[in-house]
């Protein structure tokens, strides 16, 4: 399942980040790394962006970015 498919109110764990190295670096710079727990706070009406809590702070992630983060 991807981060974009996760249900609001759920907590997921990052398994993998798809994409090229520059893209992965940008996602990891946001604090989203393998093994990190993410709480899905809210999804905008059209699914973009997804609001999450990661490492104690709130973050909005674009739908395109969320689709490349594989979670369980």
Language-model regions, residue ranges each:
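Compact, glycine-rich, soluble single-domain proteins
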Residues: 1-72
């Amino acid at each position: 399942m991807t981060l974009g498919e996760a249900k609001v109110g759920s907590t997921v764990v990052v398994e993998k980040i798809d994409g090229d190295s520059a893209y992965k670096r940008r996602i990891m710079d946001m604090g989203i790394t393998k093994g990190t727990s993410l709480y899905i706070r809210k999804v905008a009406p059209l699914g973009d962006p997804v609001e999450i809590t990661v490492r104690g702070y709130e973050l909005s992630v674009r739908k395109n970015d969320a689709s490349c983060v594989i979670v369980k």
